[in-house]
Amino acid sequence: MCVHASNFRDLVPNPKSSLCDTENSSVICAVAFGDRMEIDMINRKYYQDILDEIKGAGLWKEERIITTPQSASINTTEADAVLNFCANNYLGLANNEELKRVAAESYEKYGYGMSSVRFICGTQTIHKELEAALSKFLSTEDTILYSSCFDANGGLFETITTKEDAIISDELNHASIIDGVRLAKATKYRYKNNDMQDLEAKLKEADAAGAKNKVIVTDGVFSMDGIIANLVGICDLAEKYGALVVVDDSHATGFVGATGRGTAEYCGVQGRVDIITGTFGKALGGASGGFTSGRREIIDLLRQRSRPYLFSNTVAPAICATTLKVIEMLTADNSLVNKVMDNAKYFRSEMEKHGFDLAGKDHAIVPVMLYDAVLSQKVAKRMLEKGIYVTGFFYPVVPKDKARIRTQMSAAHTKADIDKCVKAFAECKEEFGF
């Protein structure tokens, strides 16, 4: 027996009625169970139809499984000893022996986890030491730690703006910025990627609308394109129109700029960027965790009102200890920074010799443009068969008809590794005719 939910209530006896003590109650239970099964079938079909649509459009994303530590050469369940050209392991530190030693030692001194948010009982000396070290490294006044940079961006904009303010965001900003901006009550504006003329137009619109405060936010590096933001132009306009500048430097902190201080150093605008967000999950060891660094008053306000900070567990002590060690290494030696950038330049020059359409410049991210989603997956699969691990990116990660294989160079790659990767791409180019 099956009934519609709207009619089911009429069949349920009053709890005070003697019917509840009769065999009728078992009938009601059977009806309820049947109704629940029907609803479950409808729900399952609804979501399965969405999944089938994704697969039919060639947009299904597979997760390959790695069976070794993250490194330049890895094993997967599909192939052994493949060269990894799709990790954010820019400095090659994800499996660094010194960092593993520091992490192991930290367990003895600080334990495994904190089981608390920061303001209750989740702050150790190691957390404050890392915040101070990051502030010194980035030449900012103060720093606050988050479980991820996604949380850092998610908890920033609603905290520092009100409905009287305006947020002007680059159209290609990371999803975490987009989601963070959505949470804010401020009026939102979006400007064309790295387009200073359009940014100025949006600043004028915000002024005309009576915005009390204005915040410009951009990725330091647009991660799908390998393009570095025009921070000189952004800072010039921010000063002209009295706006704050926020830069997400997740794909820059630790390896972009002469000493790895990020895009502000690369663009020569250190001291002109008000707020920097970033991650420990890429160049700085590759584990997890994020941060926001900037003016002391802003950081203090985040400690008081930023919801991801107040309601998420603190960063694990071992991550703090290893990140401190990475900052120490970068402060003492630029060799890893130089190596990853040299590798990127070499890879780009060799790929251009074969006529590949490459996006971006001056960065370890070198996207190989293929435009077709299905082709990007076929090429990625064929590359793995040739011993090269890369991933095809397509909608909704990138715009439709802009599919690509995003390669990422690491300081751990050798010239021979890069030559093998270029050779495999060249063979795929001939095989698939792109």
Range-by-range predicted roles:
Residues 3-5, 21-22, 27-30:
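Short hydrophobic alpha-helical segments enriched in small aliphatic residues
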Residues 101, 105-149:
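Conserved N-terminal alpha-helix of the aminotransferase class I/II PLP-enzyme fold
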Residues 156-175:
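Conserved PLP-anchoring active-site segment centered on the Schiff-base-forming lysine
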Residues 97, 101-105, 109, 132, ...:
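PLP-dependent enzyme catalytic core of the Aspartate aminotransferase-like
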Residues 44-112, 243:
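N-terminal "arm"/small-domain region of PLP-dependent enzymes with the aminotransferase-like
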Residues 241-244, 251, 256-362:
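Active-site C-terminal subdomain of aminotransferase-like
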Residues 338-347, 352-387, 397, 401-402, ...:
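Conserved PLP-binding catalytic core of the aspartate aminotransferase-like
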Residues 89, 189, 193-247:
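Active-site phosphate-binding strand-loop segment of PLP-dependent enzymes
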